[in-house]
Each structure stands twice: as structure tokens, then as C-alpha cells.
């Protein structure tokens, strides 16, 4: 069982040496899937890759991403959503759209802060923000507002924050011109950066891509992922995880963040995928034992060939194999 003193010094070889390992998707619960899918496809240009309905459990999953021409097919001839980068999974529990009292927790309101936002990176941020405003999209922060004038935050139908940044930056060799919109990163707040960085690097094999310290506001941002393609930058690639540390939280024994899966619910998880998810999970179990919490362990839940483990703050991470038929 993970505690505030748990450390993660042991490197998982299957994670650090597996070139097939990738940060696959981010899961958000939504109240009304028709409204939300329309929002992301019409305003941002995402495509609905797949919809999966689970009648017995009364929920549906919607998988979206920005247009890609390199998504392989699974054995059923469908897009293998678990082999792609930059996928957004929307989870709809049936009936919530008809409940006037049902409200999603967006992760940014006390006392239920934890998940922060998803981030889309664009070529021309001024043009993008102007177009979104003309289409009636609401904003939490416009470019002209706040301290940082080069980022904006749009609001999704359920109140989730969508950060908007540009990858067109002076002094960067790549990308060459516009490469379309990108699902750049997912942000979660963390209590103790030492523990979280150890976990994501040693247990899950991620690399620290960039650090951004903000002394006046007393917080630090850590950006992790499984590398940056040669023709991309850390701002134009997809599947980055941003960890936000507000200074001092690590010294408060009573402090904790909301993981999105206890009530009130909202954020669900990030998902990593690889060719042999079972072997990855087995090595983690063998080397860390009960220091890491699983719910469930690989192949032991209602849905087979998947696992969920928890990070130091209790956020869930799904582990699945490429080609999974859900």
C-alpha cells in the first residue's frame, strides 16, 4: 500500500526498454456524449475513431483524436485506438444526460481539485481563439487576460478546462510550418514531485522532457512522456503528461488531491499501452509488491487484458495491450 513515505527507486526494465510503450489516452467522464462529441469535432476538428457500448454495465466509451493517417487496424479491421497517440476517451454512464442534478467535477474547484486540464497545441493561437469565440465557445481565460498572454483556456460542455498553446515558436527548428491541431498534454496536480517523478520515470519508464519553474507564483511544472519525434517539439508532439506542484504541499501531512474517481467524479485516468502489457504489469508486481495499489490487477477484472494501478496521489493509470478488443 502506497503511503506518503513510499519511494520508487527500482527501474522497471520492461517500461524503460520497450519501444512500443506509449501514453495512449486520457479518460474524462461526460454528462451528454452527443453534445460533447459534437463540441470536440466541430470546434476543434477531432475525429470520432470508435464508440464502444457496454449494455450490461450501462456505459459507453467514445474515442476521439485529431486526424491521423498512421493508426493501425485491430484484428476486427477497426482503428486500433489503443495503438495511437493523443486519444481522448469520453466515458458516458447511461442516463446522466437526463438527470438535471448530475454535474461533472472538472477538477479545478475546491475542495475537489486534482486534475487540471487537457491541452491542445495549434499553429496560430490568435486565429484559433478568434474562431472559437465567434462560434460561441466559452473561455475561462482569454489570451489578453491574466499574467501569461500566450496561453488561453477554453471550457468544454462539462466545464473541463482546455488549455490552448502554440507550437509556432521562435528559435525552434521543428515543426516546419503548420502540422494541424495536436492533443499535446494532460495536466494533473501532485503533492510531492520527488515521489511522483520517481514513479513515472522508474515504474512507467517516462522521460522528463521539460521543467518550468514559476518562483513568483510558487509552483513548478514537470512535463513527461515517451520521447519527442524528430520532426516535432515538446510543444507540437502528443501524449505528454504535465505534473503541477504547488510548493509546500509535500510538507503538509493532511494534504491530498482529489483523484477524479471518488465522488464527485470527473477525470478518470490516463492509459499507457504496449505490445505486452501483461509482462509489464507482472514485472511491476514482482519488484514493488504491495507498495503499488492495483484495481484490478492485469486480467483479473470484469474486462480482460487490462489493469489499473495508482500513482502516489491516487490517480488511476490504465495499462492495456495494443490491439485490445474492448
From Swiss-Prot:
Keywords: Lyase, Metal-binding, Repeat, Zinc. GO terms for biological process: glutathione metabolic process; methylglyoxal catabolic process to D-lactate via S-lactoyl-glutathione. One of its GO terms (molecular function) is lactoylglutathione lyase activity. Pfam families: Glyoxalase. The gene is GLO1. Catalyzes the conversion of hemimercaptal, formed from methylglyoxal and glutathione, to S-lactoylglutathione. Can use gamma-glutamylcysteine as a substrate. Monomer. Coiled coil: none annotated. Pathway: Secondary metabolite metabolism; methylglyoxal degradation; (R)-lactate from methylglyoxal: step 1/2. Zn(2+) binds at residues 25, 89, 117, 163. Its EC number is 4.4.1.5. The active site is at residues 163, 318. Its cofactor is Zn(2+). Binds 1 zinc ion per subunit. This is Glyoxalase I. Present with 2570 molecules/cell in log phase SD medium. Residues 22-167, 182-322 form the VOC domain. Belongs to the glyoxalase I family. It comes from the Eukaryota. SUPFAM superfamilies: Glyoxalase/Bleomycin resistance protein/Dihydroxybiphenyl dioxygenase (SSF54593). InterPro entries: Glyas_Bleomycin-R_OHBP_Dase, Glyas_Fos-R_dOase_dom, Glyoxalase_1, Glyoxalase_1_CS, VOC. The keyword Phosphoprotein does not apply. It catalyses: (R)-S-lactoylglutathione = methylglyoxal + glutathione. One of its GO terms (cellular component) is nucleus. Substrate binds at residues 29, 93, 113, 117, 147-148.
Amino acid at each position: 500500500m502506497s503511503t506518503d513515505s513510499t519511494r520508487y527507486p527500482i527501474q522497471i526494465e520492461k517500461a524503460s526498454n520497450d519501444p512500443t510503450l506509449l501514453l495512449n489516452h486520457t479518460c474524462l467522464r461526460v454528462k451528454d456524449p452527443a453534445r460533447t462529441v459534437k463540441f470536440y469535432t466541430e470546434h476543434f476538428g477531432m475525429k470520432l475513431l470508435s464508440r464502444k457500448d457496454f449494455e450490461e454495465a450501462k456505459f459507453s466509451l467514445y474515442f476521439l483524436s485529431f486526424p491521423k493517417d498512421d493508426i493501425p487496424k485491430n484484428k476486427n479491421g477497426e482503428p486500433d485506438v489503443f495503438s495511437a497517440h493523443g486519444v481522448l476517451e469520453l466515458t458516458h454512464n447511461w442516463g446522466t444526460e437526463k438527470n438535471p442534478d448530475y454535474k461533472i467535477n472538472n477538477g479545478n474547484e475546491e475542495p475537489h481539485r486534482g486534475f487540471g486540464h487537457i491541452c491542445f497545441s495549434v499553429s496560430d493561437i490568435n486565429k484559433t481563439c478568434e474562431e472559437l469565440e465567434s462560434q460561441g465557445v466559452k473561455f475561462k481565460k482569454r489570451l489578453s487576460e491574466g499574467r501569461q498572454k500566450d496561453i488561453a483556456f477554453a471550457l468544454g460542455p462539462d466545464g473541463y478546462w482546455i488549455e490552448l498553446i502554440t507550437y509556432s515558436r521562435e528559435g525552434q527548428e521543428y515543426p516546419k510550418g503548420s502540422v494541424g491541431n495536436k492533443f499535446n498534454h494532460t495536466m494533473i496536480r501532485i503533492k510531492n514531485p520527488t515521489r511522483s517523478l520517481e514513479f513515472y520515470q522508474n515504474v512507467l519508464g517516462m522521460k522528463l522532457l521539460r521543467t518550468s519553474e514559476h518562483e513568483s507564483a510558487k509552483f513548478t511544472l514537470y512535463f513527461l512522456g515517451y520521447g519527442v519525434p524528430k520532426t516535432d517539439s515538446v510543444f507540437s508532439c502528443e501524449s505528454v503528461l504535465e505534473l503541477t506542484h504547488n510548493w509546500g504541499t509535500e510538507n503538509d501531512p493532511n494534504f491530498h488531491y482529489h483523484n477524479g474517481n471518488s465522488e464527485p467524479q470527473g477525470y478518470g485516468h490516463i492509459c499507457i499501452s504496449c505490445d505486452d502489457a501483461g509482462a509489464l504489469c507482472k514485472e511491476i508486481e514482482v519488484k514493488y509488491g504491495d507498495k503499488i495499489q492495483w484495481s484490478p490487477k492485469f486480467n483479473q477484472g470484469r474486462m480482460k487484458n487490462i489493469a489499473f494501478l495508482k500513482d502516489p496521489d491516487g490517480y488511476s493509470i490504465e495499462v492495456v495491450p495494443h490491439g485490445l478488443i474492448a
